[in-house]
Amino acid sequence: SKVIGIDLGTTNSXVAVMEG
């Protein structure tokens, strides 16, 4: 999830970390 969030963008990165 973290990698996906970072790949999409900084904003989504935070969401990915929360989901992960």
From Swiss-Prot:
Disulfide bonds: none
InterPro entries, sorted: ATPase_NBD, Heat_shock_70_CS, Hsp_70_fam
Pfam families in the cross-refs: HSP70
Domain of life: Bacteria
Keyword Zinc in record: no
SUPFAM superfamilies recorded: Actin-like ATPase domain (SSF53067)
UniProt KW keywords: ATP-binding, Chaperone, Nucleotide-binding, Stress response
Induction details: By stress conditions e.g. heat shock.
Gene Ontology MF term list: ATP binding; ATP-dependent protein folding chaperone
UniProt key word Nucleotidyltransferase: no
Function, as annotated: Acts as a chaperone.
Family statement: Belongs to the heat shock protein 70 family.
Name this protein carries in UniProt: Chaperone protein DnaK
